Amino acid sequence: MTPADLADLLRSTATTVLDERGLDTSALPAVVTVERPRNPEHGDYATNVALQVAKKVGVAPRDLAGWLVEALVSHAAIAGAEIAGPGFVNLRIAADAQGTIVANILKAGETYGNSDAQGTHTINLEFVSANPTGPIHIGGTRWAAVGDALGRLLARQGAKVTREYYFNDHGAQIDRFVRSLIASAEGKEAPEDGYAGDYIADIAKQVITQRPEALTLTEPERSEVFREIGVDLMFTHIKESLHEFGTDFDVFTHEDSMHTSGRVQEAIAQLRKTGNIYEKDGASWLRSSNFGDDKDRVVIKSDGNPAYIAGDIAYYLDKRERGFDLCIYMLGADHHGYIARLKAVAAALGYDADSVEVLIGQMVNLVRDGQPVRMSKRAGTVITLDDLVDAIGVDAARYALIRSSVDTSIDIDLELWASASSENPVYYVQYAHARLCALARNAADLGLQHSTEHLELLTHEKEGALIRGLGEFGRILQNAAALREPHRVARYLEDIAGDYHRFYDSCRVLPQGDETPGDLHAARLALCLATRQVIANGLDILGVSAPERM
């Protein structure tokens, strides 16, 4: 019996209890809250439904709780129920009912934890979207990990998800990139507002290799050659780095295409028709303050060139016309102002502002020997994705970046995350999986097969704690998806790994010496295999490997 199953049982029981007494059943919440008590002595689960409903139906909370207890104790799945405090109900689940969690996990396999909770959404998930002017920095790397995990999570909860990278290849930063390449090719210092680092020199050399005559060309042809080849080489490197990091995209959209295809002009024309564009001081303004923004925004500057938001308007409209009902943007810490701005764009175009969600990620700091790591040899200035992977590996990098809420800054201790230690969270979780795989191999060598026939034998408190933890997986995934917080999955896996290690230390799974394998061994092996499956499913959501040996 999972928490969701118990919540359904509590609601149906409460409905019957109220109905039998002529009380209003509509006072019940759509979903009854079920929680695991902090103190295991208080039971397996607790609910506050009596406290929620009693006042609405005109009875004392403890009276309603008492009626619920009377009805629940007769149910086969309930081993015990009692009133606590002002009207809480503490519950103990029967071992055989609890054991169905194990059987269900083994039956569902890789799909365990999946649901259709997000099935109504067709989601465009845009993340990373780094400028093609240098390698992906550590902030973008955080989004590469979190965005990919969120996409996997939402897909497991039934959403149709398209992972998209918006390629910012339009604007002044590209001009600075091109001037930096040309300066490097000529053996000069980078422009004061340009880019430096080994990667600039490498790309400049490759441009000359492909077009030996490039430096002899006159402008604007020379800049166009460096732009075309240089941007392509940089973007190729970015995509390769992301792929090696385990993050792939379904769609790459070029910002420049919004302008060259006429999409920007079309979007602005649509806003003019609805009266949401006006003219002032020679510029065209969006009435964004009418839709929750703190001020109106210039969309066409007085010199006739589109402002940056013009591309955002066209891009959002493009997404909607491609069939997405929800557009999630994952942006850096300096983009808080974009939340109201993008929602205003949606509303001005006639869509629900809630069709835009903006997640803001905070800073990432790297630490080695207690000191901050600030410089990258490759990039010349900032730490990059490749730097982090070189230091601690893909799995540790992804896990370290995912396991904390994105709205908090994180410090990554490179020594800790590279260590084979239980203090290293990813090692701790992966070791639990590898240990389970080793146990399964040893069981096979002994001829022991798992069985779900006698799961009622799993009555040890450590077995119960592990089973109840496994039963939370579906609810964890649903909440994590709804809140757009994949870090909840990582923290859950650490809890499950802890539950498993404590179970293993207290409950012998394999027969010893001449001991004949029995039903309890087979049931415990089934519990171990179910635990292995849940850990593997969770690591898959995070894009982290589940090693069979360590």
Curated annotation (Swiss-Prot):
Subunit comment: Monomer.
Keyword Iron set for record: no
Cross-referenced InterPro entries: aa-tRNA-synth_I_CS, Arg-tRNA-ligase, Arg-tRNA-synth_N, Arg-tRNA-synth_N_sf, ArgRS_core, DALR_anticod-bd, Rossmann-like_a/b/a_fold, tRNAsynth_Ia_anticodon-bd
Gene3D superfamilies: Arginyl tRNA synthetase N-terminal domain, HUPs, Isoleucyl-tRNA Synthetase, Domain 1
Gene Ontology biological process terms, A to Z: arginyl-tRNA aminoacylation
Top-level taxonomic group: Bacteria
Name of the molecule in the record: Arginine--tRNA ligase
Reaction(s) catalysed by this chain's protein: tRNA(Arg) + L-arginine + ATP = L-arginyl-tRNA(Arg) + AMP + diphosphate
Family (UniProt): Belongs to the class-I aminoacyl-tRNA synthetase family.
Cited SUPFAM superfamilies: Anticodon-binding domain of a subclass of class I aminoacyl-tRNA synthetases (SSF47323), Arginyl-tRNA synthetase (ArgRS), N-terminal 'additional' domain (SSF55190), Nucleotidylyl transferase (SSF52374)
Chief location of this protein within or outside the cell: cytoplasm
Keywords noted in UniProt: Aminoacyl-tRNA synthetase, ATP-binding, Cytoplasm, Ligase, Nucleotide-binding, Protein biosynthesis
Subcellular location: Cytoplasm
One Pfam family it belongs to: DALR_1
Keyword NADP assigned: no
One MF annotation (Gene Ontology) recorded for this entry: arginine-tRNA ligase activity
This protein's GO CC annotations: cytoplasm
Motif 'HIGH' region in this chain: 130-140
HAMAP family: Arg_tRNA_synth
EC number: 6.1.1.19
